[in-house]
Amino acid sequence: VVGGDECNINEHRSLVAIFNSTGFFCSGILLNQEWVLTASHCDSTNFQMK
């Protein structure tokens, strides 16, 4: 993000952090109760969704 501003922790409740066994992996946006939209570079078979 270029020129972005910090936000409060509850300001964007649809933001998702994806972690793998080594820590933070990628981020995404919660579309509904089942789906998270991420960038294509977040695709990996090295993690399991819970």
UniProtKB/Swiss-Prot annotation:
It is found in: Secreted. It is an enzyme of class 3 (hydrolase). Disulfide bonds join C26-C42. Expressed by the venom gland. Keywords: Blood coagulation cascade activating toxin, Complement system impairing toxin, Disulfide bond, Fibrinolytic toxin, Glycoprotein, Hemostasis impairing toxin, Hydrolase, Platelet aggregation activating toxin, Protease, Secreted, Serine protease, Toxin. Residues 1-50 form the Peptidase S1 domain. Inhibited by serine protease inhibitors PMSF, benzamidine, leupeptin and aprotinin, as well as by copper (Cu2+) and manganese (Mn2+) ions. Not inhibited by metalloprotease inhibitors EDTA, EGTA and 1,10-phenanthroline, as well as by barium (Ba2+) and calcium ion (Ca2+). One of its GO terms (biological process) is proteolysis. Optimum pH is 6.0-10.5. The active site is at H41 (charge relay system). Snake venom serine protease that interferes with the hemostatic system of the prey. It preferentially degrades the Bbeta chain (FGB) of fibrinogen, with minor effects on the Aalpha chain (FGA). It presents a lower ability to degrade fibrin clots than BpirSP41. It shows a decrease in the clotting time of human plasma in the presence of increasing doses of the enzyme. Belongs to the peptidase S1 family. Snake venom subfamily. Acidic enzyme (pI is 4.7). Negative results: does not degrade the gamma chain of fibrinogen (FGG). This is Thrombin-like enzyme BpirSP27. It comes from Bothrops pirajai.
